[in-house]
Amino acid sequence: MRLPREIGPIHFVGIGGIGMSGIAEVLCNLGYTVQGSDASEGANVSRLRDKGIAIHVGHQAENVAGADVVVVSTAIKRDNPELLAARAQRIPVVRRAEMLAELMRLKSCVAIAGTHGKTTTTSMVAALLDAGEFDPTVINGGIINAYGTNARLGAGEWMVVEADESDGTFLKLPADVAIVTNVDPEHLDHFKTFDAVQEAFRDFVENVPFYGFAVMCIDHPVVQALVGKIEDRRIITYGENPQADVRLLDLTPNGGSSAFRVAFRDRKAGTAHEIADLVLPMPGRHNALNATAAIAVAHELGLSDDTIRKALAGFGGVRRRFTKTGEWNGVTIIDDYGHHPVEIAAVLKAARESTKGKVIAVVQPHRFTRLQSLFEEFCTCFNDADVVVVAEVYPAGEAPIEGVDRDHFVLGLRAHGHREVIPLQESAALASVVYGAAHSGDYVVCLGAGNITQWAYALPGELKALD
């Protein structure tokens, strides 16, 4: 049985969240009656309202009146008045992943998981399948520049979704094709141990049906170890590793883009194939690896080499993934969502490869618990930055932790050999700090999952005002 067409209204608590908004948009486009609430106004709320979805600002019990089902994310606390009202009225309450799973049952599905790179890889798979005239339905964790949204309803038989592992609910997703980009210690507030994280990813891959396949990056040692543990499922490995089934070769940075080729090896059939002259209009080895995963899926689903080559060259990127927000006197300002040490290191390496000037990193640490649990890693991931500007921790609803703050982070960076680390007293002071540090040819990279994106977009204008 599939989601009945007559069900509704479907009420989303926290509808403006990036994960929730995409599901709500696709359900609305399918013809379901969708409504919701969010704590504040925002771009996603405005976009959904423009589609005719009724959205309340603020959470109140009466908002769920008349709903057939209430959808919540893990960000919604148990004492939320709408959640309490739904349960008091015996309205079914489902998690975000459960509703996503209902949509996935309508199509064949590619699900992209991993600690880092999910959103970009999801966008790349979508772009390639779009170019191959698959007309896929897409639900992503970031705004795809080509669509201007994080979701679209396609008429084709395939769906491409980002699988969020943060609360373990990605195990509910019925994927036919699974991608695993990497597995690092993250979301330990839910999983408790890194062993549990790895076991969840193993289960995610083993949930793929026997007629499907998984695409896994063996450049990552944890993923390589997982490949050896998975039984009775078809695995396609990728990476620069010589043992990979789909191998990234001759990666050459070229300013803001990357050139490379990809070689395919079918061990069972004893055949080999190569796609040469690939160009991705994004810098960084991590993005080339993400593209290799997408190419592996596209090739397996029958796309031609030329289609893959053209689609990749025209890839428009994802908002908040190495996004240029402007320039000032030859200085390039970049906005990036990177908030984990592995992501930060990859983004700064891409910036280093893109310029002969200095790389100035502006970081807004996201969550006290993340900074605490990965403090050593945070203190060693800025090696490609000439200057590190450190803002106050963005709490994301967390209470402060003694000894885990901006100033201790600054001391930690200096203790690990960084010679120029600047504590940012307030966001309004960022322009003057950059004005004094940056020169033509430099890159200023704003990093974090909080409101630092607003600073990144305001910075070019603020710098011009100081001239």
From Swiss-Prot:
From the UniProt record, give the pathway where this protein acts. Cell wall biogenesis; peptidoglycan biosynthesis
UniProt organism field: Rhodopseudomonas palustris (strain BisB18)
Q: Name one GO biological process term.
A: cell wall organization
Record function comment: Cell wall formation.
Q: What class of enzyme is it?
A: ligase
Q: Which UniProt keywords apply?
A: ATP-binding, Cell cycle, Cell division, Cell shape, Cell wall biogenesis/degradation, Cytoplasm, Ligase, Nucleotide-binding, Peptidoglycan synthesis
A GO molecular-function descriptor: ATP binding
Q: Which family does it belong to?
A: Belongs to the MurCDEF family.
Compartment list: Cytoplasm
Q: Which domain of life is it from?
A: Bacteria
- Coiled-coil positions are none
Q: What is its EC number?
A: 6.3.2.8
A Gene Ontology CC term for this entry?
A: cytoplasm
Designated name of the protein: UDP-N-acetylmuramate--L-alanine ligase
Q: Name one Pfam family in it.
A: Mur_ligase
Binding positions (ATP):
114-120
